[in-house]
Amino acid sequence: MIYKLRDLLGVDELGGTMRLGRYACDLAPGSVARRIYGQDQIWERHRHRFEFNCLYEPTLAQNGMKVSGRSPDGKFVEIAELPSHPWFVAVQFHPEFQSKPLKPHPLFASFVEASYRHKTGGRGQEAVGSRVQVGHL
């Protein structure tokens, strides 16, 4: 389902061939990712040579997985999620590159929030995405 970037197929010398840097990602309406970020488009950092094989997308969609983030040109799947799961969000980028101890990345904050809700049976104040405050939980 994940393979080497199509632009690199047949390339053996991989020096300088990564998808590297900051790229835009359009978020699907009604998706978990859109709720977490609270916006239509995000910018995230990449450092990889791999991409999602879109030939598998119909089969995965039939089994509940939703592509919820794509590059603006539609070429790359950036985020996939399982809407039926309490918190299943898979990303192609590196959210840790934009996370700080006192300002966690929205994905990390949302994951901690979902974990807290799971542990407490949903009790406690909800804090979504980047609005989580350190020490709040």
What are these regions (language model features)?
Residues 1-137:
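Amide-donor transfer/coupling interface in amidating biosynthetic enzymes
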